[in-house]
């Protein structure tokens, strides 16, 4: 049977000491005592309000930092077992859980049972406290927990072994054994004085009729029974003899327990009214939060734009406003509910809650004290029959019965004597009286009470002595405990056991009252979020102004995140048990586990040395405990007193006080968010002015656009993805971004006239190969344009020197992706005006020198980016830089208005993409992630233009191929889709640097196919890895110049994109050549306005972590989180609107264009593409002929700009792919090239702002995702604790902005990853994989000692190892003929055993060598060596496989195969059984077995005659094949498999046996056909050597 208890803990020094010292150490013993008292649940009371969120417990290495956790939380230093308590924002050392083993104390004198304390006056009903978080559930059972049991965070205690498991990510992971060493049994306390009990006994004489039964023998006298008439009382006097009443066992009759009806006390349950709070559900009004739309104001964040333009994302920081969602936080007010503590009275019922402690329940034994039940004794009246004469003496026992009358509880005091009473204990049945407990239902609130356990329960631990109670009489001693019973009053709460009704919590509705907070609902108006309006002038965002009053605490926010749960169980926790962040304590071993990323990882052993039973102390005085009766004001809980005994558990009830958290108070009005203030007109996007100096990275803005999906996998946290600096010189190949969606297939433009071949610009320096972006979606195959004349392959300009990648500015708001539209501008493409003559393709200008590519370094001034108002602050998340990742890609957010992308304004200057040069800081490329932009490769579509292939020339740069790693880009090949002009297959070249193969692009010209010659470069294909650099794909790097495209910056005016309208003349596209300047794409910055998308940010992290302000989320743990309530104001999240200002982020803008991808939705702008109608312009794609420009692809470094991919729509031009002839223009792919600007993707770094996604923060066990906090608002969901109330979760609605999906996985806090938000462009796909934050791996297969130092930053190690395989034996000539040798057994193995580690320490051990096969008939094969792992005081052994065994008898018909290796896993009480070697002539060796993190080895096949025997299997790895040689009928045995490889095959004549690998066994021998008899065979196969593989991750 599994018992489930919900524990809500409140902490005080005293309670902690009790909880740790008494409860844990004795809990197991109590459980084992099986002294469970069950009370018949009374009628459930109104469901009480949910209790306050409990405190959280942090388990980490080292001293806690004050910024960690919230007041009331606990912190355990796993290195020292020091316990800290947070109070007044500081962590104070409370003590050490590992205490010295105390000397066994002297048995204290059993004190007199104290008087039962007066039932305290009914306390004033406290304010209804906020619903607390659902506490961890403690499950009890026998044996391993079942996967489907419990929820993440729950604890399971295996009563058989004492092992505690915690459920993390659906898996029960062993944590610690609560069961300490069996303490010495305390001395049996002196039996308390029998007490006055006897008084009422007089009547009792009749009572024991049962006892009389004993007298029954005398029954003969029974006839005298007639005399019974005389019994009328006179005989009753004899009742005095009743003392004999001890026999009171008859007391069982105690059923009188019916008195339990008294349970009516349940009236206390009325407290349930609190439950009404359910109205809180109304909180839904908070949904009005829609005002969030106002968030546009948030735009202020725009300042962040300065960040590197991307920084705007920082506005997302406003997301903090999202925090307003916090209004839900008001739910935190429920914290006030803490007052509910009064409900604590019900808490008495809570005692049953204690049942959770079940062990304590033992105290219930005291219930035996229930002697009141003795009252049942009244049944004794039956005893009257006692007159039966002398039996009456038995009657004395009856007196005991009388006690029964006392049972009315009054006598209870006597119960103290109850020790003796113990017999009466049977009467304990009275427990039924517990029904009275019904009142207890009210007790549900009491559950809160469980916290009440307060540890006093620990005293119950003494109850261990109670064990004596088994004698029943001794139990009486336990009775002493009875004093605790006084608390029992609270006991009524005990009925609470019914808490199961918790479902009732639906009542939580009462919480609804908080609903008034709902007022915030007005904020709801925000609903219109409205237009997102014009991202507004981002302009004045500045005011953001009065976030003002924080408004009314607003409706109680969503329930705070459910705190970490503490689960108890016996044995290793099941994987499906508990949630990330939960703690599991193994009662068997005391090991404490924490669930991380779905895995229960052992943390520490809180069991400590079980001190000697310690001084039983003056248990005697325990009596005083009676005072507890006051129970605080809980007092009047009513008469339940009788039940009281069970009540002892009651203390738990007090937890209610935790409620006091109470007034978390009004979060402060937060006031009305104040009018969000008009989102100022987005003011003129302004000149976009010179790109000012990259201002300080503003505060990390709001999560901004949904942002990148962020890491998938279990990443612990992707870490901050720094902002991707400006893509300096063709910056490093960005990470392969996600394959962008195929853009709309552009109209097939007219085939422009083939422009003049531009002069080959100087080949720029091949920038670092950017990370290969994800293979973009294969764009729609544009109509194959007329194959333009293959333009002259322009000289591949010198690739400008890779400028310093400027600081990765904050990824602008992703600016208006729209701008990509201007691609039309694409430099001199000039007005593109009349396609007219296709102009001279302009000069392709000089390609403008590619500007200086200016200092791109500075990424221009990015101008002041206007005032960008103050929002600047959050701007700094800026650095998230780190890919953030991908963030949710959010809703792509509103994509806001993409709107002003037009402003993109100046992109204007882009002007000097010139120095793109700085690329300098590719620096933050850190987020290689941005490579994601490469994702754009999607444009690959332009493969078409491969035509230019021309400049394959610079392929030389390919140098960066190094990034080939990126090969990923090959993915981009996806765009090969463009293959449409299959003819152009050429661009496949983009398949990566595939070598410059890109030039193969010229093949595009396919006419020019001759150029395909460059395909030769394909040889470079090797570089394919660089496909990422595909950018280099020739000077496509200059495409970077595309940078001139940078002027595309003016594109910013994308509004002018209208000009693209001119596109009609597609003809001019020829000038595309200028694409080069794209460099300034930097201006893309203004894209910043996208900022408004920020609102999506709200998704906040789904994660648990605070990640940010989520702090309000309060510590994930049991903490009150209450304050989070304040977050309630989140409602204002609307203000996030200010994020709108984020617009300024526009400066990022340049990249911003990509950023839009987030808005990719805006791809709609592609609508501008509508102008694409002019795609004709693409016709100029012929210009693409300038593919040479592609050289600038180097700019790709700006991949960041990938944002432009958004315009991928432009890809439409790809339609011109028809011009693929000009494929040279593929360089235009370069427009993807703009993706090149992607280099700016560096700005994507700003994507970092998505970092806010980072908030996703912790999904998993994270302690606190860090700032994710804003998601924190989601935190309010926390109240979900009342799960019933979950309704409130509704507020989560804001999540709408899913925005930052943030990290998925267990990441503790993806950190700023959020910034990736801007990625909007899937490009960031960034990194996938295990985001536990992989640190490094260690692998060693050399037999002997090894030591692997734990790397810096690592906290988790996954260890895989195997012992050496056994060697195969030699064949034999026996009477039955030639018998083949037996195969060796496979080694035992450990697989991905999770261990928590600490940098500076080392994992060491011994690697087992291979067993050697028998060399000849005179030698024996040897056993494989054991591989040993030393982990602190634990030793894990992967045993070596055993060798094939030679037979000593000439008459044998087989040679036995070796047995598989064993495994020694300290986590298991029973190790997996190894496969046995085969002994028969046809049966395979036994298969290896599997258990937690380990496998035993399989047995080897037997050597036989006429038949063969294969080795056993392990999982999917088969044993080696046995082989029979028909020449001499000798059959060899195959080696047994290991968990990592198949066994070696047996030998066949003329073919030697195979040796094992990775710990598998070697095959057996047979005659080789040569040599000298009897050693004319092959030596047996050797076993495979053992190895150790350790993967280190940070958590």
Curated annotation (Swiss-Prot):
Chief place of localization: virion
Regions of compositional bias (Low complexity) in chain numbering: 181-190
Q: Got a GO cellular component term for this one?
A: virion component
The Collagen-like domain is annotated at 97-155, 175-233, 236-295, 299-358, 380-559, 608-907, 920-1039, 1043-1102, 1128-1307
Q: Does the record carry Glycoprotein as a key word?
A: yes
Q: What does the function comment of this entry state? A: May participate in the formation of a layer of cross-linked glycosylated fibrils at the viral surface thus giving it a hairy-like appearance.
Q: What is this protein called?
A: Collagen-like protein 2
Taxon lineage: Viruses, Varidnaviria, Bamfordvirae, Nucleocytoviricota, Megaviricetes
């Amino acid at each position: 049977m599994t018992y489930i208890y919900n524990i809500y803990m409140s902490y005080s020094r005293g309670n902690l000491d009790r909880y740790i010292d008494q409860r844990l150490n004795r809990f197991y013993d109590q459980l084992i005592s099986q002294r469970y008292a069950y009370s018949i649940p009374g009628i459930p009371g109104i469901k009480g309000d949910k209790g306050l969120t409990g405190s959280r417990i942090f388990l980490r290495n080292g001293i806690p930092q004050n910024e960690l956790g919230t007041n009331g939380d606990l912190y355990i230093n796993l290195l020292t077992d020091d316990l800290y308590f947070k109070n007044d924002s500081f962590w104070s050392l409370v003590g050490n859980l590992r205490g010295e083993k105390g000397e066994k104390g002297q048995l204290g004198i059993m004190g007199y049972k104290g008087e039962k304390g007066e039932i305290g006056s009914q306390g004033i009903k406290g304010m209804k406290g906020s619903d607390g978080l659902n506490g961890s559930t403690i499950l009890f059972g026998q044996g391993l927990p079942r996967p489907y049991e419990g929820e993440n965070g729950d604890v399971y205690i295996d009563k058989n072994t004492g092992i505690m498991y915690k459920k993390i990510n659906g898996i029960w992971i062993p944590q610690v054994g609560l069961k300490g060493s069996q303490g010495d049994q305390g001395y049996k306390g002196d039996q308390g004085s029998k007490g006055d009990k006897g008084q009422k006994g007089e009547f009792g004489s009749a009572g024991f009729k049962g006892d009389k039964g004993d007298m029954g023998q005398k029954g003969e006298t029974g006839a005298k029974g007639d005399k019974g008439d005389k019994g009328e009382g006179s005989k009753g006097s004899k009742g005095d003899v009743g003392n004999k009443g001890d026999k009171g066992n008859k007391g069982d009759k105690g059923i009188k327990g019916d008195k339990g009806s008294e349970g009516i006390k349940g009236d206390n349950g009325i407290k349930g009214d609190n439950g009404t709070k359910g109205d809180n559900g109304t909180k839904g009004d908070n949904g009005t939060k829609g005002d969030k739309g106002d968030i546009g104001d948030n735009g202020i964040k725009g300042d962040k734009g300065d960040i590197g333009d991307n920084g705007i994302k920082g506005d997302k920081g406003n997301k903090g406003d999202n925090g307003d969602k916090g209004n839900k936080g008001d739910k935190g007010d429920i914290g006030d509910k803490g007052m509910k503590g009064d409900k604590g009275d019900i808490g008495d019922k809570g005692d049953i809650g204690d049942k959770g402690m079940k062990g304590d329940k033992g105290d219930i034994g005291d219930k035996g004290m229930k002697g009141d039940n003795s009252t049942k004794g009244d049944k004794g009246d039956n005893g009257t029959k006692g007159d039966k004469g002398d039996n009456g003496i038995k009657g004395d026992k009856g007196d005991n019965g009388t006690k029964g009358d006392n049972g009315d509880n009054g006598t209870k005091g006597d119960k103290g004597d109850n020790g003796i009473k113990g017999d009466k204990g049977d009467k304990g049945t009275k427990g039924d009286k517990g029904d009275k407990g019904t009142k207890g239902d009210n007790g549900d609130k009491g559950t809160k009470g469980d916290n009440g356990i307060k540890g006093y329960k620990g005293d119950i631990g003494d109850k261990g002595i109670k064990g004596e109670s088994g004698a029943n009489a001794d139990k009486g001693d336990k009775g002493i405990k009875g004093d605790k019973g006084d608390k029992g009053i609270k006991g009524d709460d005990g009925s609470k056991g019914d808490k199961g009704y918790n479902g009732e919590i639906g009542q939580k509705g009462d919480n609804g009252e908080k609903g008034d907070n709902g007022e915030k609902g007005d904020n709801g108006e925000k609903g219109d979020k409205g237009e997102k309006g014009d991202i507004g002038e981002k302009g004045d965002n500045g005011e953001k102004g009065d976030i003002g009053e924080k408004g009314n605490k607003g409706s109680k926010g969503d329930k705070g995140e459910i705190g970490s749960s503490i689960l108890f169980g016996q044995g290793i926790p099941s994987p499906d048990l508990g949630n990330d962040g939960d703690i599991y304590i193994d009662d068997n071993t005391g090991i404490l586990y924490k669930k991380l990323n779905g895995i229960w990882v052992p943390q520490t052993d809180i069991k400590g040395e079980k001190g000697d039973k310690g001084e039983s102390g003056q248990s005697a005085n325990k009596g005083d405990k009676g005072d507890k009766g006051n129970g605080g004001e809980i007092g009047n809980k009513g008469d339940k007193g009788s039940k009281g005994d069970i009540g002892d558990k009651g203390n738990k009830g007090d937890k209610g006080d935790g409620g006091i958290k109470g007034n978390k108070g009004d979060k402060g009005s937060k006031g009305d968010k104040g009018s969000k203030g008009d989102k100022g007109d987005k003011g003129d996007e302004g000149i976009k002015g010179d790109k000012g100096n990259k201002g300080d990275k503003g505060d990390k803005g709001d999560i901004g656009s949904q942002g990148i999906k962020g890491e998938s996998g279990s990443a612990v946290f992707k870490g901050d993805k720094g902002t991707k600096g400006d893509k300096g010189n063709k910056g490093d190949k960005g990470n392969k971004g996600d394959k962008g969606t195929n853009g709309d297939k552009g109209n097939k433009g007219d085939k422009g006239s083939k422009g003049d071949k531009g002069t080959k610009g100087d080949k720029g320096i091949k920038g670092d190969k950017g990370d290969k972006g994800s293979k973009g979606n294969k764009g729609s195959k544009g109509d194959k344009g007329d194959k333009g004349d293959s333009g002259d392959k322009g000289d591949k300009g010198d690739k400008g020197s890779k400028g310093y990648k400027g600081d990765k500015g904050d990824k602008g708001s992703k600016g208006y992706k729209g701008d990509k539209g201007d691609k039309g501008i694409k430099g001199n493409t000039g007005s593109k005006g009349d396609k007219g003559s296709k102009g001279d393709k302009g000069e392709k200008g000089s390609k403008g020198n590619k500007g200086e590519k200016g200092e791109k370094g500075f990424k221009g001034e990015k101008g002041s980016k206007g005032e960008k108002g103050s929002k600047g602050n959050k701007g700094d998340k800026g650095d998230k830089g780190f890919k953030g990742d991908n963030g949710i890609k959010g809703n792509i957010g509103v994509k806001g208005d993409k709107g002003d992308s037009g402003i993109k304004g100046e992109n204007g200057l882009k002007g000097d993409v010139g120095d793109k040069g700085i690329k300098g800081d590719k620096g933050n490329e850190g987020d290689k992630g941005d490579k994601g932009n490469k994702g754009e490769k999607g444009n690959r579509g332009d493969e078409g233009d491969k035509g230019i292939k021309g400049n394959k020339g610079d392929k030389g740069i390919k140098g960066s191929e190094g990034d080939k790693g990126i090969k990923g880009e090959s993915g981009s090949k996806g765009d090969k889709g463009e293959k449409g002009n299959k003819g152009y297959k050429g661009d496949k070249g983009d398949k990566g640097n595939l070598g410059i193969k890109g030039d193969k692009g010229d093949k595009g010209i396919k006419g020019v196919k001759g150029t395909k010659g460059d395909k030769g470069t394909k040889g470079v294909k090797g570089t394919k890895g660089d496909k990422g650099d595909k950018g280099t794909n020739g000077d496509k790097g200059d495409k970077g110049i595309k940078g001139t495209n940078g002027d595309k910056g003016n594109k910013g005016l994308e509004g002018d994109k209208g000009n693209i309208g001119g596109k009609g003349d597609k003809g001019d596209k020829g000038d595309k050549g200028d694409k080069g300047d794209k460099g300034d794409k930097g201006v893309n910055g203004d894209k910043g306005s996208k900022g408004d998308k920020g609102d999506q940010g709200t998704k906040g992290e789904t994660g648990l972590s605070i990640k940010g302000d989520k702090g309000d989320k309060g510590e994930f743990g049991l903490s009150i989180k209450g304050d989070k309530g304040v977050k309630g104001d989140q409602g204002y999240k609307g203000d996030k609107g200010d994020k709108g200002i984020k617009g300024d982020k526009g400066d990022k803008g340049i990249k911003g264009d990509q950023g839009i991808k987030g808005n990719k939705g805006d791809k709609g702008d592609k609508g501008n593409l509508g102008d694409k109608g002019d795609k004709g312009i693409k016709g100029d794609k012929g210009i693409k002929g300038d593919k040479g420009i592609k050289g600038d692809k180097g700019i790709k470094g700006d991949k960041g700009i990938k944002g432009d991919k958004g315009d991928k729509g432009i890809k439409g031009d790809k339609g011109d792919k028809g011009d693929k002839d000009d494929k040279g223009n593929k360089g235009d792919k370069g427009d993807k090239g703009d993706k090149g600007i992607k280099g700016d993707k560096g700005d994507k770094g700003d994507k970092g702002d998505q970092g806010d996604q980072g908030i996703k923060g912790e999904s998993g066990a994270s302690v606190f995702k860090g700032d994710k906090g804003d998601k924190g608002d989601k935190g309010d969901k926390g109240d979900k604790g009342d799960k019933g109330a979950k309704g409130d979760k509704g507020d989560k609605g804001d999540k709408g902005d899913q925005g930052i999906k943030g990290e998925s996985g267990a990441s503790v806090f993806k950190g700023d990853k959020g910034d990736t938000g801007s990625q909007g462009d899937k490009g960031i796909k960034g990194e996938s994989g295990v985001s536990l934050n992989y640190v490094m791996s260690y692998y060693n297969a050399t037999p002997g000692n090894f030591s692997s130092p734990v790397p810096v930053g690592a906290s988790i190690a996954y260890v895989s190892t195997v012992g050496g395989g056994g060697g195969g034996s030699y064949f034999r000539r026996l009477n039955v003929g030639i018998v083949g040798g037996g195969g060796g057994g496979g080694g035992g193995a450990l697989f991905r055993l999770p261990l928590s580690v600490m940098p500076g320490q080392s994992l060491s051990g011994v690697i087992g060598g291979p067993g050697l096969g028998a060399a000849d008939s005179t030698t024996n094969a040897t056993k494989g060596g054991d591989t040993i792992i030393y982990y602190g005081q634990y030793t894990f052994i992967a045993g070596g496989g055993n060798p094939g065994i030679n037979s000593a008898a000439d008459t044998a018909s087989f040679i036995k195969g070796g047995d598989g290796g064993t495994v020694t896993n300290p986590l298991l009480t029973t190790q997996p059984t190894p496969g046995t070697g085969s002994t028969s002539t046809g049966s395979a060796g036994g298969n290896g077995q599997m258990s937690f993190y380990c496998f035993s080895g399989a047995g080897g096949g037997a050597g036989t005659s006429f038949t063969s025997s294969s080795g056993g299997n392990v999982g999917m790895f088969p044993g080696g094949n046995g082989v029979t040689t028909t020449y001499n009928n000798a059959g060899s045995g195959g080696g047994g498999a290991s968990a990592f490889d198949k066994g070696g095959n047996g030998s066949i004549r003329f073919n030697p046996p195979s040796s094992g690998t990775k710990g598998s066994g070697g095959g057996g021998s047979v005659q080789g056909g040569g040599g000298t008899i009897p050693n004319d065979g092959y030596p047996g196969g050797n076993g495979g050597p053992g190895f150790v593989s350790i993967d280190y991750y940070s958590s």
